[in-house]
Structures are given as structure tokens and as C-alpha cells.
């Protein structure tokens, strides 16, 4: 049943992508890909018509459903029949399809990334971080095999496309080597060699009860330095997400000031660096969602 669903969804996706020709931003990594996806959506969504994955729609079923803009049918044959009818209507009727799709692409086992990039033409690829102890290693005998699988995304970018890489993660930084000619590469990180350099990171706290806290930092790109002040942001992992989004935003013609204006408040995801009020005047940082060691340290 699953293979049949995959096949049908893949066909519908290819038809819709060929019909509407949206630009596609794809994100992967073992750490921070969902936060990066949300940050990219927040930036691009301010200036373009954009759609991104909802919930955990980042696999061979979820990515096509995001392309279709339809909820899945679960275990119901009748609901899946309705999904396919909706897809046919989208193909026939036309309409106000998004200009840009922001797609998180998860990798659980060998072949996953090759499958997704086999029918999704990627204009901009973002690789967040792998880390020393990455998640999702159950089906990969060695860490290098997982890295190789994720690097397929960078190598699959269309001619004259964009690849955005985490400079501070050596495994990700090295993915810039051997990319096809004509691909533009932007790196981001705290390291001095990053294209987009993060600096002056500080956490401010005025009143937790009133939600008056957040982070300030600066992003520098090609001599331009712009300060960022983002409410309700805690942790450097979210700063990395913003920097990744800045790289994508500039690939779509935005400047750092326009990107900064999209981040007055931080997106909040369940289980990802959220503050929860505890007992005895304590506060708990909830960063528990499928967390890897790198994401929580």
C-alpha cells in the first residue's frame, strides 16, 4: 500500500511542479533542519508567496503532500481517494500556487535523499549540521555514509543554483568541494572564514514572566554588517537557523536589512528551546524534541 501511495504521489508532484514551476528550497541535516526551515519560511514569507512542510511531512509521503498542499489520508482508503481527487483538481483548475516551496527533507536510511531529489528540482539547498554524534544512524553503518547521503542534496541543485552550508560543521563545510560548476555557495557560522559571519551574540533577559527576553547578534556579509534583535530567542542553534535563512534570502535578492526586518519575533516550535514555567520560581528550557547531543549542548 505504501509503495503504491508513494508512486501516485510522486506522479502528481511531478505534474504540479512542471505546471506551476515554483522555486524550491530544500533543507536537510542531523541538527537544526526544522528550525532552519521555519526561519527560511519566516524570511521568504514576508516577501513572497511561500509554502513549507507542516508537522513531520519531510519524507517520501510528506514531501509530495506538501507540494500538493493537502493533508494525508492516514490509514483510510476513502481519505486517500479524496486526496487524489483534490490533487487532480489542483492540476486541472490552476490557481494561486506558491512562488516558493520550502521543503525539509529527512533522511532515515540509504536512498531517501536520492529518491526525493529524483522528482523535486532543487533551486537552493541548505545543509545545517551533522555533529559528532548524529541522529538517524540506525540504517547507516558509518557516519560517513550518512554524510554522503545528505550531501546528495547539495549535488542535486539545478544549474546556477544556490547551496548554503554551515561553515562551523567541518563535515558540512567540506560538501562545497566538488559541487557542479556554476553553483553559488554561501557559508554561515561564527568562524572567520564564513561568508555570513555571526558575531556579538548575547542573550538578554529583562522579565521572564512578561516574555521580555531574547538575543542580539550581528550578521556580516561582504562588508555589510547588520544587527539583529529577536524576541524570545534562546540558544545559538536558533542563531544558526537565522543565518541559514539569511543565506537563502540573499539568494532570492533580499539584503540583510530586509532579512532583519522579518525577525522581530522568533518562531517557536514545540520541544525546541522553549521556556516553560516550573515550580518554586524556576524555568525549564524545553529542547527535547528528537534532540541530538549537538542540539542540546
Each model region followed by its residue ranges:
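A conserved segment at the C-terminal end of the G1
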Residues: 27, 35-53
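N-terminal pre-Walker A segment at the start of P-loop NTPase domains
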Residues: 1-10
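ATP-dependent carboxylate-amine ligase catalytic core
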Residues: 10, 14-20, 45-148, 235, ...
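Glycine-rich phosphate/pyrophosphate-binding beta-alpha loops
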Residues: 271, 289-296
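Acidic, Mg2+-coordinating active-site environments of NTP-dependent enzymes
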Residues: 20-22, 98-99, 117-118, 122-283
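Short beta->alpha connector loops
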Residues: 106-110, 169-170, 290-291
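Short catalytic-loop micro-motif centered on adjacent basic/acidic residues
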Residues: 26, 51-52, 100-104, 163-164, ...
Amino acid at each position: 500500500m505504501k509503495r503504491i501511495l508513494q508512486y501516485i504521489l510522486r506522479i502528481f508532484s511531478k505534474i504540479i511542479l512542471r505546471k506551476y514551476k515554483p522555486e524550491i528550497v530544500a533543507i536537510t541535516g542531523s541538527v537544526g533542519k526544522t528550525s532552519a526551515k521555519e526561519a527560511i519560511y519566516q524570511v521568504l514569507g514576508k516577501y513572497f508567496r511561500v509554502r513549507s512542510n507542516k508537522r513531520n511531512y519531510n519524507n517520501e509521503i510528506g514531501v509530495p503532500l506538501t507540494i500538493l498542499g493537502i493533508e494525508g489520508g492516514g490509514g483510510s482508503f476513502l481519505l486517500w481517494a479524496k486526496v487524489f481527487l483534490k490533487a487532480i483538481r489542483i492540476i486541472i483548475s490552476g490557481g494561486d500556487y506558491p512562488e516558493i516551496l520550502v521543503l525539509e527533507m529527512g533522511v532515515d536510511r540509504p536512498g531517501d535523499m536520492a529518491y526525493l531529489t529524483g522528482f523535486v528540482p532543487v533551486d537552493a539547498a541548505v545543509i545545517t549540521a551533522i555533529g559528532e554524534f548524529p541522529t538517524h544512524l540506525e540504517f547507516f553503518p558509518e557516519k560517513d555514509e550518512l554524510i554522503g547521503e545528505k550531501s546528495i542534496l547539495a549535488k542535486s541543485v539545478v544549474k546556477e543554483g544556490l547551496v548554503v552550508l554551515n561553515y562551523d560543521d567541518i563535515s558540512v563545510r567540506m560538501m562545497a568541494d566538488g559541487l557542479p560548476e556554476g553553483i553559488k555557495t554561501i557559508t554561515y557560522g561564527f568562524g572567520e572564514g564564513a561568508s555570513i559571519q555571526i558575531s556579538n551574540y548575547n542573550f538578554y533577559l529583562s522579565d521572564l514572566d512578561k516574555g521580555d527576553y531574547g538575543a542580539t547578534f550581528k550578521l556580516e556579509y561582504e562588508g555589510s554588517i547588520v544587527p539583529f534583535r529577536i524576541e524570545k530567542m534562546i540558544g545559538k542553534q536558533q542563531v544558526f537557523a537565522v543565518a541559514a535563512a539569511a543565506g537563502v534570502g540573499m539568494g532570492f535578492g533580499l539584503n540583510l536589512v530586509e532579512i532583519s526586518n522579518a525577525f522581530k519575533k522568533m518562531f517557536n516550535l514545540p520541544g525546541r528551546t522553549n521556556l516553560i514555567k516550573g515550580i518554586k520560581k524556576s524555568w525549564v528550557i524545553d529542547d527535547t524534541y528528537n534532540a541530538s547531543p549537538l542540539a542540546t549542548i
